Regions:
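N-terminal targeting signals for export/organelle localization
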Residues: 1-65, 199, 203-204
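Short loop/turn microsegments at loop-to-beta-strand junctions
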Residues: 60, 84, 164-165
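Short, acidic, Ser/Thr-enriched surface-loop or helix-capping motifs
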Residues: 66-68, 170-171
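Active-site-proximal beta-strand/loop segments in catalytic clefts of secreted hydrolases
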Residues: 88-90, 120-123, 146-147, 182-183
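Structural microenvironment flanking redox-active thiols in thiol-disulfide oxidoreductases
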Residues: 97-137, 148-154
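Thiol/disulfide oxidoreductase modules built on the thioredoxin-like
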Residues: 132-140, 146-201
Length: 204
């Protein structure tokens, strides 16, 4: 698949950072310690899949201040029994801007399948700028406001906080089914989300 230069640069950046951060994961050596997801070295991969479902690890208690609504807390537990797509982003991040339309399309195409998207906005210490990003890009799903990246620590041991954007697909038990350490297109993400959404709910 051919990518514009921005997408190539983003993927290359993810590869370099992921290779140097000891906390990334691969589909071959993902580990679940006590049922908890742990990132391990990605070996240069930017698309990581975890099968069978019984081998998947769960993320922690993802929760934080809602980006768009003052005084509201948004949590992963708000979406019990749903497939959840977590996207870590910042308005300052070029690849995040590049993938915004694609993420929104996948969200619209899959939400009737019991799929929810949840953003985690990081390193934006001016909240208004992050809110403008949501409005200008017509993002229809919520985001947690996490300028200090504290929420990221709940995503798994050794989470690679340097890799932005990152997208994590959680199954209906909120275990990690896939991780993307790169900017995404519809054709990258939608087939994976649909496959996970179609898994038997008692699988694993």
């Amino acid at each position: 698949m051919k990518f514009p230069s921005l997408r190539l640069a983003a993927a290359a950046c993810s590869l370099v950072v992921a290779a140097t951060v000891a906390g990334c994961a691969t589909g071959d050596d993902a580990v679940a310690q006590g049922g908890t997801f742990v990132f391990v070295s990605p070996g240069g991969k930017t698309e990581l899949f975890y099968d069978p479902p019984s081998d998947r690890g769960a993320v922690g208690k993802v929760s934080g201040e809602d980006l768009m609504t003052d005084g509201k807390t948004t949590s992963l537990t708000d979406y019990e029994g749903q497939v959840v797509v977590l996207n870590v982003w910042g308005q300052w991040c070029g690849p995040c801007r590049g993938e915004a339309d694609d993420l929104e399309k996948v969200y619209e195409n899959t939400k009737d399948m019991g799929v929810q998207f949840l953003g985690i906005n990081v390193r934006d210490h001016t909240k208004d700028k992050a809110q403008d990003f949501v409005v200008n890009n017509k993002v229809g799903y919520p985001s947690i406001y996490d300028p200090e990246m504290r929420t990221l620590l709940t995503l798994g041991k050794n989470y690679p906080t340097s890799v932005i954007p990152t997208t994590i697909v959680l199954d209906r038990q909120h275990r990690v089914a896939a991780v993307f350490l790169k900017e995404l297109l519809v054709e990258d993400l939608q087939p994976v989300v649909e496959r996970v959404a179609q898994e038997p709910q008692d699988q694993g």
